[in-house]
Amino acid sequence: MKEIAINEKISYLEGTENPLSADIGIIREGDALWLYDVGSGERAISQLTGSYHVVLSHFHQDHTGNMGKLHIKEAFVSDETKHHIKMGTVADRDIYIGNLHIFPLPSSHCKGCLGLEVDETYAFVGDALYSKFRDDYYIFNAQLVKDAIAVLKKLKAPYLLVSHFKGLVRCRDEVIAELTELYQHRGKNSPEIKVKRG
């Protein structure tokens, strides 16, 4: 897989659909190499031969499947992810390491999402902007949408790096505006926001 540069410190290996594998963020922080997610399947990691610090966005297999196949110095995970993969240091609050900021990110996609802000310029958010699916609807938890907006507003990075999104980069302010509009469509007595698919 080809490594795609975002800037001089940040690049990524593009995810695949078959087999399903998430994008893998690569961050050069001083002498250390960091990965945001590790993908799934041999093809995803064929050129990752070093030793890495890892932040896992969440526990789904397409983001964590290669954990046992890489040389990992340390891994930062949510409590939910640790429950599933049985390894890593739980990041249940903001953690700052050099120019990196690891942060919990509320999400309707699944419990236990983590983001990674780099140099206050880009923030990896994994699948946290996505919803669950039921019947013909995208299902968002209204409170989690509100909480995610609050977290995103506190970030300094103007750009978000979103897994499974072509080109990865989204403008943070545009995402906040979309989530704010979504939140305004919540029902008065329902904890869910339902959006018709298609």
Walk through the language-model features, giving the residues of each:
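Conserved beta-strand hairpin/beta-sheet module of binuclear metal-dependent hydrolase folds
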Residues: 1-47, 114-130
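Residue-level marker of motif borders
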Residues: 4, 53-57, 104, 122, ...
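Metallo-beta-lactamase
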Residues: 4-8, 32-33, 69-195, ...
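Short, flexible loop segments at the rims of nucleotide/cofactor-binding pockets, characterized by
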Residues: 11-17, 33-39, 53-56, 100-106, ...
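Active-site HxH/HxHxD metal-binding segment of metal-dependent hydrolases
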Residues: 16-17, 40-98
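Active-site environment of divalent metal-dependent phosphoester hydrolases
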Residues: 20-21, 42-43, 59-66, 82-85, ...
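Extended recognition/assembly regions associated with phosphoester-bond processing machinery
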Residues: 100-101, 170, 197-198
